[in-house]
């Protein structure tokens, strides 16, 4: 710390001392300048003031001045010492007399009275570069002008800023290394003959054209020179290299590459030059010599120091909004996708262990959470047990992924991620709530369930070590089950606090699908008029949930405000006349690209199966049947029930020309819900070899791995290099694990290897489907060889309770409303004829991105219904939020009033 403070003061003081040397010399130079006219680079023709006599100035004076100023470099050493030639007693000869400091001062005194006051024309000494002698110096480094006015004030301001930093913010100033500045190898300007690799102009693109106050500039030592940094006594940003940041105008690593800023800039192609010139037309970048810097040496005599950006800044994130998550392309309908031909200008920065082809294929773009999402995240991280809700498309799942990542960073162990259904659990990389509890279906009395859990050592340990329990799709969790979980947690953890001291984070929308009502008693008898019991009705909810937050901002239908209003009018079941008319107008057929038809949503699974079978039978050709491989340790009745929650079918029938849907997220464009068409069935190895033969000249080892990236294989060895700040969906893609664990060579790895062998035996003589997917922009297609994937329900130790291996495809002419919950569909047809459940109409209609991608058949407002308990719950919730906001406003007003009174008294 002390060395860093001394370094700043030492550099500032040393620069001032050398600046004084320059100023002392300038009076002599002014006298010489009044007699000298530099007309070309080869001959110097001095002239007497009277203009009557010309003579050649001796070369000794020329070399003495240049050598003196060249050695007098404020950055040549990190120590304050007399290192120049004159301070060592060395002298130069001028007209037969040695030139020393004293002689220069004497010349100065003699000419002060004789020399006229410098004018604007003679304030600058022009020196032109000899191209034969100075090939290793940039044109911009040898500026044609030397401004010495106002420099003393700049130095004093810089020194004052350094003193304020050392006095007030000593804790913020850190040096990662004590490496002193290395003195660059001095090369004589006359003896330099080696051409420089960096000839031509170097633009400081990272330096703002509107330069801030000189007092905000500081310098940083580096192995290759001095970096110009921008700092402030009141705002200092710490990074791995320096407590200050480089003044920059870029915002992301990709933009850095687009602007051509790098450690080793090379020659640009014509296309790149055109792009660069177009981006610079509005405000031309400043050259190195044009940047005002209070510590700079006169540019015509200084060495070519490097001023380069800090390359270890991985991303540009705003302070306080560092929690990244992903925004799928289906939620950005208005954003055009980049043209593949433009990839040469938009290459991502390479990361260790991730090749460039993979980076382009796995283009998962991070976003910043909204203010309300950020507020929820902060409440969760502070330990508050809460429930957050919102209408369809408000980013509940996006926020949940960010919450999971942040909690796992805070608690490496003890974060249980669960959901009410297997499908919802797969979407967030978790397990079902029943699997977490370890009591099977959860039927029976609490005492018996506790005994069952205690016999299961893993389940018992899981209950004892859990710190945070996350439940997604809480709307489908029965209230009686939540009460049982609360009692079990208190008993197993021997803690009478709510949920035994476990923090509870619940997410969902009760206006969507309700819990499944059990219409049979424990003895098997049929029950009539069984009313649903929601989670918010349970005593566990009232005891545990401390805060409820409603998300207001909608992302899925963003840009179609009328459609947002139409969907909001459906939530409580009271459909206005104008909203009903708007939905009736959506009965027109949709326009889709050739070969793709909209997916139809039906209320029952029977309708879905019949519609898909009819469509498949109309296609000529042979049917290719893929049977799933199902395993697990659960007994058969429970295993079968859990498998029904998986979106992957037990039997998948495909033909060439069949419309399918991808049911896994692979990047921000090829996501769960992307429609495609089977164009062929190919052998995987043969297809890869044929692709390699088509492009033999351009294929490299990196491109081979990039091609593997387009082939979805959950059984490839998990990649151990994962970006630290990667979103959850991106980590799942890299590791191939839904549970997001990079497994070592353990029993779990051996188990998965055995599953792979079993799968390959079943698919031994079968080919893989080649699918042409329509990306969410509605224009771009991507052709992919699809390989089998694995869906598992596991406990925290990795033991597979239930597993299914199947291709991540389903026939997509028709889907059930139940399985469409949580998905985003670009083209969808909703037939409301057989809708029977509360919330079904709202779930089905809200899957669409916009009205342009939605067709509604048989719209009937009587089919739109919401449960009265849910309506009452949200009504009370809304009034409670209003009271909280008004109370907070009153509190803020009181605090402001108290502060005003205190100021008045002072």
Curated annotation (Swiss-Prot):
Disulfide-bond pairs as recorded: none
Annotated region of DNA binding: 840-859
EC number of the protein: 5.6.2.3
Main location: nucleus
Keyword DNA damage included in the entry's annotation: yes
GO molecular function, one term: telomeric DNA binding
Catalytic activity: Couples ATP hydrolysis with the unwinding of duplex DNA at the replication fork by translocating in the 5'-3' direction. This creates two antiparallel DNA single strands (ssDNA). The leading ssDNA polymer is the template for DNA polymerase III holoenzyme which synthesizes a continuous strand; ATP + H2O = ADP + phosphate + H(+)
GO biological process terms held by the UniProt record: double-strand break repair via break-induced replication; mitochondrial genome maintenance; negative regulation of telomere maintenance via telomerase; replication fork reversal; telomere maintenance; telomere maintenance via recombination; translesion synthesis
Compartments in which it is found: Nucleus; Mitochondrion
Binding site for ATP: 390-397
Regions of compositional bias (Basic and acidic residues) in chain numbering: 78-87, 120-132
Record keyword Membrane present: no
Cofactor(s) this protein cannot do without: Mg(2+)
Keywords (A to Z) from UniProt: ATP-binding, DNA damage, DNA recombination, DNA repair, DNA-binding, Helicase, Hydrolase, Isomerase, Mitochondrion, Nucleotide-binding, Nucleus
Biased composition (Polar residues): 88-119, 234-261
GO cellular component labels: mitochondrial membrane; mitochondrion; nuclear replication fork; site of double-strand break
A Pfam family reported for this protein in Swiss-Prot or TrEMBL: Pif1_2B_dom
Functional note: DNA-dependent ATPase and 5'-3' DNA helicase required for the maintenance of both mitochondrial and nuclear genome stability. Efficiently unwinds G-quadruplex (G4) DNA structures and forked RNA-DNA hybrids. Resolves G4 structures, preventing replication pausing and double-strand breaks (DSBs) at G4 motifs. Involved in the maintenance of telomeric DNA. Inhibits telomere elongation, de novo telomere formation and telomere addition to DSBs via catalytic inhibition of telomerase. Reduces the processivity of telomerase by displacing active telomerase from DNA ends.
Protein family membership: Belongs to the helicase family. PIF1 subfamily.
Protein name: ATP-dependent DNA helicase PIF1
UniProt source species: Candida albicans (strain SC5314 / ATCC MYA-2876) (Yeast)
């Amino acid at each position: 710390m002390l060395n860093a403070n001394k370094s700043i003061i030492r550099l500032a003081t040393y620069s001032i001392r050398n600046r004084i040397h320059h100023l002392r010399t300038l009076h002599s130079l002014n006298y010489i300048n009044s007699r000298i006219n530099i007309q070309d680079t080869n001959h110097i023709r001095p002239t007497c003031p009277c203009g009557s006599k010309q003579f050649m100035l001796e070369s000794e004076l020329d070399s003495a001045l240049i050598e003196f100023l060249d050695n007098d470099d404020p950055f040549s050493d990190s120590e304050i010492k007399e290192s120049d030639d004159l301070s060592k007693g060395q002298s130069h000869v001028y007209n037969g007399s040695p030139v020393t400091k004293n002689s220069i001062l004497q010349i100065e005194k003699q000419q002060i009275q004789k020399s006229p006051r410098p004018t604007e024309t003679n304030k600058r000494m022009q020196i032109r570069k000899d191209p034969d002698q100075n090939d290793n110096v940039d044109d911009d480094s040898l500026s044609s002008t030397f401004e010495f006015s106002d420099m003393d004030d700049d130095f004093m301001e810089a020194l004052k800023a350094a003193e304020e930093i050392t006095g007030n913010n000593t804790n913020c100033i850190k040096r990662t290394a004590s490496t002193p500045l290395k003195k660059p190898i001095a090369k004589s300007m006359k003896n330099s003959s080696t051409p420089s690799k960096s000839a031509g102009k170097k633009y400081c693109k990272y330096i703002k054209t509107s330069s801030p106050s000189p007092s905000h500039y500081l310098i940083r030592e580096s192995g290759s020179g001095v970096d110009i940094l921008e700092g402030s006594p009141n705002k200092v940003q710490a990074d791995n290299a320096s407590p200050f940041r480089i003044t920059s105008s870029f915002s992301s690593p990709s933009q850095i590459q687009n602007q051509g800023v790098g450690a080793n800039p090379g020659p640009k192609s014509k296309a790149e030059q055109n792009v660069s010139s177009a981006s610079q037309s509005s405000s031309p970048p400043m050259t190195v010599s044009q940047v005002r810097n209070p510590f700079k040496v006169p540019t015509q005599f200084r060495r070519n120091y490097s001023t380069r950006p800090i390359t270890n800044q991985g991303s540009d994130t705003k302070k306080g909004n560092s929690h990244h998550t992903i925004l799928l392309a289906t939620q950005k309908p208005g954003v055009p996708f980049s043209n593949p031909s433009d990839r040469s200008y938009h290459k991502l920065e390479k990361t260790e262990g991730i090749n460039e082809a993979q980076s382009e294929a796995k283009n998962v773009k991070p976003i910043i959470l909204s203010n309300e999402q950020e507020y929820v995240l902060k409440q969760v991280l502070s330990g508050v047990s809460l429930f957050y809700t919102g209408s369809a498309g408000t980013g509940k799942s996006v926020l949940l992924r960010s919450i999971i990542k942040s909690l796992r960073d805070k608690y490496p162990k003890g974060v249980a991620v669960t959901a009410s259904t297997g499908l919802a659990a797969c979407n967030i990389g978790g397990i079902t709530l029943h699997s977490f509890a370890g009591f099977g279906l959860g039927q029976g009395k609490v005492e018996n369930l506790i005994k069952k859990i205690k016999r299961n050592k893993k389940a018992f340990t899981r209950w004892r070590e859990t710190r945070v329990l996350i439940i997604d799709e809480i709307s489908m969790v029965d209230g009686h089950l939540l009460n049982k979980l609360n009692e079990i947690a208190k008993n197993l953890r021997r803690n009478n606090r709510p949920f035994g001291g476990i923090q509870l984070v619940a997410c969902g929308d009760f206006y969507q699908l309700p819990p499944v009502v059990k219409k049979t008693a424990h003895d098997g008898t049929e029950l009539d008029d069984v009313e649903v019991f929601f989670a918010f009705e349970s005593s566990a909810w009232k005891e545990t949930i401390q805060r409820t937050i409603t998300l207001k901002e909608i992302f899925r239908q963003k840009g179609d405000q009328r459609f947002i209003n139409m969907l909001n009018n459906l939530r409580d079941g009271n459909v206005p006349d104008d909203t009903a008319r708007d939905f009736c107008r959506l009965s027109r057929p949709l326009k889709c690209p050739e070969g793709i038809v909209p997916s139809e949503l039906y209320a029952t699974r029977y309708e879905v199966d019949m519609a898909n079978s009819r469509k498949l039978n109309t296609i000529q050709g042979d049917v290719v049947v893929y049977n799933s491989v199902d395993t697990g340790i659960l007994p058969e009745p429970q295993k079968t029930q859990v498998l029904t929650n998986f979106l992957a079918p037990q039997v998948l029938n495909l033909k060439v020309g069949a419309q399918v849907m991808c049911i896994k997220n692979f990047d921000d464009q090829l996501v769960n819900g992307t429609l495609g068409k089977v164009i062929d069935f190919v052998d995987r190895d043969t297809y890869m070899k044929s692709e390699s033969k088509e492009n033999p000249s351009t294929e490299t080892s990196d491109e081979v791995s990039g091609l593997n990236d387009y082939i979805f294989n959950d059984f490839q060895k998990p990649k151990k290099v994962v970006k630290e700040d990667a979103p959850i969906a991106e980590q799942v893609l890299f590791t191939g694990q839904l549970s997001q664990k990079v497994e070592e060579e353990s029993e779990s790895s051996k188990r998965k290897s055995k599953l792979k062998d079993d799968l390959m035996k079943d698919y031994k003589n079968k080919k893989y489907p080649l699918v042409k997917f329509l990306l969410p922009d509605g224009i771009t297609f991507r052709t992919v060889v699809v390989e089998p994937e694995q869906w598992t329900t596991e406990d925290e130790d990795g033991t597979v309770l239930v597993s299914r291996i199947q291709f991540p495809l389903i026939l997509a002419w028709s889907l059930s409303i139940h399985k469409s919950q949580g998905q985003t569909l670009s083209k969808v047809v909703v037939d409301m004829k057989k809708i029977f459940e509360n919330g079904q109409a709202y779930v089905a209609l809200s899957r669409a991105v916009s009205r342009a991608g939605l067709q509604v058949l048989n719209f009937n407002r009587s089919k739109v219904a919401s449960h009265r308990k849910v309506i009452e719950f949200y009504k009370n919730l809304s009034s409670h939020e209003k009271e909280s906001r008004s109370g907070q406003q009153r509190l803020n007003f009181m605090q402001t009033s108290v502060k005003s009174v205190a100021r008045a008294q002072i």
